[in-house]
Structure formats: structure tokens, C-alpha cells
Amino acid sequence: MHVLSVSSLKGGVGKTTVTLGLASAAFAKGLRTLVVDLDPQADVSTGMDIDVTGRLNIADVLASPKEKVVRAAIAPSGWTRGRPGKIDVLIGSPSAINFDGPHPSIREIWKLEEALANVESDYDLVLIDCAPSLNALTRTAWAASDRVTVVTEPGLFSVAAADRALRAIEEIRRGLSPRLQPLGIIVNRVRIQSLEHQFRIKELRDMFGPLVLSPQLPERTSLQQAQGAAKPLHVWPGESA
């Protein structure tokens, strides 16, 4: 089971949209996938068409990462209706904010790792949609991960946030989790004709070299349309998808 965190230390860069796109790609490839909705906004759970009735959620798991609790907080995505494949969601909740303090204990940081160990044989891939901060929830996600991808957009403040994120990943790798590595930087919401965007992409490449992943993701209405309809991007109709 490979665990990938999708992170950004700045809100509004399309982190959750990227998570949903990666989930759609994994589903299209037939990978048994679990998406962990760790962002207190819980938008992944909405975007993947989850029925939360009678189920526990990520806050319950962080309080008690036992197998019984973990399995009760996992629901199949509505994407699977009428389509083959396995893609589940560990349901998000605004209550997760209660576990996002600035100074988590070592015990708290390892709770998600403990929870995922209970379902390790069930999945090929785990995607974690992280909170847009560097508090306890993000550190908990990174401690449970093999790789982290950092989502940014080609703007001044977002470039600075990507730099902070990569420095923090290295800090966690050295101090807590030697297996953790950055997968790279996904540059999202690119307007190809924008000189400012071209400048910022060059700046990112100058700063981070091969960590800047290709291709960069242009702004596309199909992403918002698929997300708004709670459908996987890879089955969304039209050339724009």
C-alpha cells in the first residue's frame, strides 16, 4: 500500500481538486484506492458522492484509531455506481479541526499511521487530502505517508508557500519519518498566455529543478464541472476533460 499526501500550505490553490483528479486517475487505472479526507472542510467527501448516514468519520478515527472505528468511518464512493472498481473514502468532518493544534504530541502524530495499518491489505493506494496548514493534521498525514506532493499555483505567495512546504517535509523526514520523500510540485491553474505565470513557473524551476512536475495543469472548466457534479474527471464528457 502506497500512501501519498496532497498538500498545500496556502488555501485556494486547488489542492482538493488535484486530489479528486488523482483519485479519478487511480479509479480509471483499476487501483484499489482509499481517499482520506483530512481537510476539515470535508470537500473530498462531497466531491466523491459519499453517503455519510450512520457512519463515523475522520474525527472518530483520530480519537480512537482501532480497526473497528476505522472501518466504520470508510464509505464507498458514489463513483462506483454502475462502474467496476474499488474506491473508498475515509469520511471527512469539520470536527477534525479539534485535532489540528499547533503542537501535537508524538502519540497524536502517529494516529493516522496506526489507523491505516488496520486496512493495509485492502488498498493499493491511499491519497490524503491534507489541511492547508502546517499544524497537527498535516503532520499526522505526512507521518503516515511515503510521498508528499505539494500543490501550488504560479503566484508570488504560492511559490513562497511551496518553499515552506518542502522545507517542512524535510524536517519531518529527518525528525520523524525517514521514509517520507517529496514526490514533487504540481503547478495548478496555469494560464498559458500569462507572462506572470510564465515567470513564476520559471522561478519554481530555478528554485526546485526536477521537483517541478510536468505537465503543469491549466485552468479548465471541466474540472469544476466534474467536481460540482460529484463525478470522476476521467468519465466526464467533452473534449475539455
Stretches with model-predicted labels:
Residues 1-241:
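P-loop NTP-binding core
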